[in-house]
């Protein structure tokens, strides 16, 4: 039996407006090579100037993971040649990163586990190569976008743990508002270092790096395949022959990893301090500002339970994304019953979001949902009618809630005289059952409620029906 050893390197783009060493925009998806300047293009004489906001965002992250913040850190040149790297070196941090140490607590199947973080350092992103059938193009819009590289300890022991760690990290970055962490756009990318060893052995064996994984699903499948490949090689006596230090890519069509190149050691990058950049000195004012971080998901889970009486499972779902959390807080801050908010948000509205639509892109925004929930809470419509109204609003979100209720004829009748007339009619037609009820057969009350609601075609306010029925049977 083997034990799996996994360490993860995550590159997340920081959501600064400009690049890390120049004033070019970091906007995504624009025409190729329109956000470039002499610094991005590595023209002779162009000098880098550090973006202060990137430093502050790195400090905020370090604070969130209980890390050591180095008040003095240094930028280095990481030397390698690639077409999307105009300088033939990347400006990164090596010996003294801005963030050292730290931890994340993950939860897998109800069991909590501490995952150590080695470091988080600032660096610049490379450009993007676009390969056609007979030629390649280079887009340097991305070159120089600020990256925070977050390196975990090799503490992960399964693909499930790896995904749990990445989801926790993703949540922290989003709740801190330091990165949009959009995996589809490449602003949250993961390299997985995977090795195996016999159970009980503490030695670290040959690690294989799987590069540029950009979905939780593929990260899990890539790790599982690589573990299976290495295990089979060991059992066949071919471990030394087939498993060596290399970089592999994940084939998302065939769900296998494929060899890309030999994995470099740090010495091969010939790191040395960048002579164009002074050491980064974090003064007290910058530090004090950067460590003021917002409430994170774990803290919100605790608060939702204490303040609003939300169940733990529901609280976890409410913080599954920052957009869901904001939506919920908009609802409860409008003084609507938290229980009502949870039910209609997690079950009813969320259940209607399909085909890639999320709470962020929901046709019904929080303001419209507040109007709608107030009509349920004040008894204007019943819960059953509310589902019809919500269905209609999903298709016609711009329409007024009250106008929709009137149009669909779903407004509850709360007029005492109209309800009493029906109650008296039902009681007169069921004199024998009235006698049974008065003789102590309490369950007959439910029969009367059902008959009245049926006669009222669902338009009667159930609470009012109960109140008036009790008085007429007294």
From Swiss-Prot:
UniProt EC number: 6.3.5.-
PROSITE patterns reported in the protein's UniProt record: GATB (PS01234)
Name of the protein described by the UniProt record: Aspartyl/glutamyl-tRNA(Asn/Gln) amidotransferase subunit B
SUPFAM superfamilies: GatB/YqeY motif, Glutamine synthetase/guanido kinase
Originating species: Campylobacter curvus (strain 525.92)
Alphabetically ordered keywords of this record: ATP-binding, Ligase, Nucleotide-binding, Protein biosynthesis
Entry-linked HAMAP family: GatB
Gene3D superfamilies: 1.10.10.410, GatB domain, N-terminal subdomain
Gene that encodes the chain: gatB
Molecular function via GO: asparaginyl-tRNA synthase (glutamine-hydrolyzing) activity; ATP binding; glutaminyl-tRNA synthase (glutamine-hydrolyzing) activity
Catalytic activity annotation: L-glutamyl-tRNA(Gln) + L-glutamine + ATP + H2O = L-glutaminyl-tRNA(Gln) + L-glutamate + ADP + phosphate + H(+); L-aspartyl-tRNA(Asn) + L-glutamine + ATP + H2O = L-asparaginyl-tRNA(Asn) + L-glutamate + ADP + phosphate + 2 H(+)
UniProt xrefs under InterPro entries: Asn/Gln-tRNA_amidoTrfase_suB/E, Asn/Gln-tRNA_Trfase_suB/E_cat, Asn/Gln_amidotransferase, Asn/Gln_tRNA_amidoTrase-B-like, GatB, GatB_C_1, GatB_Yqey_C_2, Gln-tRNA_amidoTrfase_suB_CS
Keyword Nucleotide-binding: yes
SMART domains linked: GatB_Yqey
NCBIfam families per UniProt: gatB, PRK05477.1-2, PRK05477.1-4
Family assignment from sequence similarity: Belongs to the GatB/GatE family. GatB subfamily.
Function: Allows the formation of correctly charged Asn-tRNA(Asn) or Gln-tRNA(Gln) through the transamidation of misacylated Asp-tRNA(Asn) or Glu-tRNA(Gln) in organisms which lack either or both of asparaginyl-tRNA or glutaminyl-tRNA synthetases. The reaction takes place in the presence of glutamine and ATP through an activated phospho-Asp-tRNA(Asn) or phospho-Glu-tRNA(Gln).
Any GO BP: glutaminyl-tRNAGln biosynthesis via transamidation
EC supergroup of this enzyme: ligase
Domain of life: Bacteria
Subunit structure and binding partners: Heterotrimer of A, B and C subunits.
């Amino acid at each position: 039996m083997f034990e799996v050893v996994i360490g993860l390197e995550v590159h997340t783009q920081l959501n600064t407006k400009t690049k890390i060493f120049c004033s070019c925009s970091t906007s995504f998806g624009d025409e190729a090579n329109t956000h470039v300047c002499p610094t991005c293009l590595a023209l002779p004489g162009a000098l880098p100037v550090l973006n202060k906001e990137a430093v502050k965002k790195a400090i905020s992250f370090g604070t969130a993971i209980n890390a050591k913040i180095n008040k003095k850190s240094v930028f280095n040149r990481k030397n390698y040649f690639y077409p999307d790297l105009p300088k033939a070196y990347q400006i990164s941090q090596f010996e003294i990163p801005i963030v050292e140490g730290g931890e994340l607590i993950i939860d897998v199947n109800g069991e909590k586990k501490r995952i150590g973080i080695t470091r988080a350092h600032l660096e610049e992103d490379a450009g993007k190569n676009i390969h056609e059938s007979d030629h390649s193009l280079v887009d340097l819009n991305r070159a120089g976008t600020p990256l925070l590289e977050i390196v975990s300890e090799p503490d992960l022991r399964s693909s499930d743990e790896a995904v749990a760690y990445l989801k926790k990290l993703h949540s922290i970055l989003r709740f801190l508002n330091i990165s949009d962490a959009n995996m589809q756009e490449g602003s949250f990318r993961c390299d997985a270092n995977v090795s195996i060893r016999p159970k009980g052995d503490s030695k670290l064996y040959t690690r294989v790096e799987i590069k540029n994984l950009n979905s939780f699903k593929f990260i899990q499948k890539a790790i599982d395949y690589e573990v299976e490949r290495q295990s089979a090689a060991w059992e066949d006596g071919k471990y030394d022959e087939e498993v060596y230090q290399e970089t592999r890519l994940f084939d998302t069509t065939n769900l296998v990893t494929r060899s890309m190149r030999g994995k470099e050691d740090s010495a091969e990058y010939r790191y040395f301090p960048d002579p164009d950049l002074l050491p980064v000195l974090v003064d007290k004012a910058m530090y004090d500002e950067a460590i003021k971080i917002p409430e994170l998901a774990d803290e919100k889970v605790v608060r939702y339970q204490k303040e609003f009486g939300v169940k733990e499972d529901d609280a976890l779902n409410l913080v599954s994304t920052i957009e869901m959390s904001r939506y919920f807080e908009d609802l409860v801050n409008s003084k609507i019953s938290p229980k009502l908010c949870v039910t209609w948000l997690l079950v009813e509205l969320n259940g209607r979001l399909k085909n890639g639509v999320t709470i962020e892109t929901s046709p019904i925004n929080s303001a419209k949902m507040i109007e709608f929930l107030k009509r349920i809470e004040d008894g204007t419509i019943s819960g059953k009618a509310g589902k019809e109204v919500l269905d209609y609003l999903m298709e016609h979100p711009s329409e007024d809630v009250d106008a929709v209720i009137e149009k669909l004829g779903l407004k509850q009748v709360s007029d005492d005289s109209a309800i009493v007339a029906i109650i008296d009619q039902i009681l007169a037609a069921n004199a024998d059952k009235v006698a049974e009820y008065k003789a102590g057969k309490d369950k007959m009350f439910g029969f009367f409620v059902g008959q009245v609601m049926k006669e009222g075609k669902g338009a009667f306010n159930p609470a009012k029906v109960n109140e008036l029925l009790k008085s007429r049977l007294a």
